[in-house]
A protein has these predicted regions:
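Sec/Tat signal peptide C-region and signal peptidase I cleavage site
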Residues: 18-22
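Early exported N-terminus immediately downstream of N-terminal targeting peptides
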Residues: 53-56, 60
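Bacterial N-terminal signal peptides
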Residues: 9-17
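Short N-proximal segments of mature Sec-exported proteins
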Residues: 99-113
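Long, amphipathic alpha-helical surface segments
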Residues: 11, 23-48, 60-65, 72-91, ...
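Bacterial N-terminal signal peptides that target proteins for export
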Residues: 1-8
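Surface-exposed patches in mature extracellular/periplasmic domains of secreted proteins
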Residues: 49-53, 91-101, 139
């Protein structure tokens, strides 16, 4: 059942991203893995405008002392996204083939939600990966709540991300 969902999610992403990549005549599958992560984030986040403040670019949350403007160009937003993803990748590069999947998830939910902080323990997802358990689809897709409610858009996003970046 979950394999069918993965396949459907992957097909949805390929169909939706086709127009984005058609401008350069590049297939999603032909891109290097990090570039696929960038395309995936750009698709799901979109370029944020004034109504999404304090988020700018492709979902970057402004931190104290940062002075990025809401009126970023697409090129500036792309550079900021790549810098953010590389910073997050540094946290997870020790996780081998799951590093990109964890990087992508942490861009949306935060590094602290995965690694744990303060009184919050490490996520069950990381615990399973560290234990060598490769059956963590349920734990990955469980990061689909906003203010306690399950959002179907986030469920679909997690399914597509898992289909694209999970390596058995």
């Amino acid at each position: 059942m979950w394999m069918a969902k993965r396949l459907i999610g992957f097909c949805m992403l390929c169909i939706v991203c086709q127009p984005l990549l058609a401008q350069r005549k590049v297939r999603l599958a032909d891109l290097p893995p990090f570039e696929r992560v960038v395309v995936c984030v750009k698709y799901f986040e979109g370029l944020h405008g004034r109504e999404h403040y304090p988020y700018v670019g492709y979902g970057h949350r402004l931190l104290p002392g940062e002075n990025f403007t809401i009126n970023m160009t697409e090129r500036q937003a792309d550079a900021l996204l790549r810098a953010d993803l590389m910073k997050r990748f540094e946290y997870f590069k020790g996780y081998g083939k799951d590093a990109l999947l964890l990087t992508l998830l942490s861009y949306n939910v935060g590094v602290g939600r995965l690694l744990g902080y303060g009184k919050h323990p490490k996520s069950r997802l990381l615990q399973k990966i560290e234990a060598g358990d490769r059956n963590f689809y349920k734990e990955y897709v469980s990061f689909c709540r906003y203010e306690g409610k399950i959002l179907q858009g986030l469920v679909r996003r997690r399914q597509v991300e898992f289909a694209l970046f999970y390596l058995p």
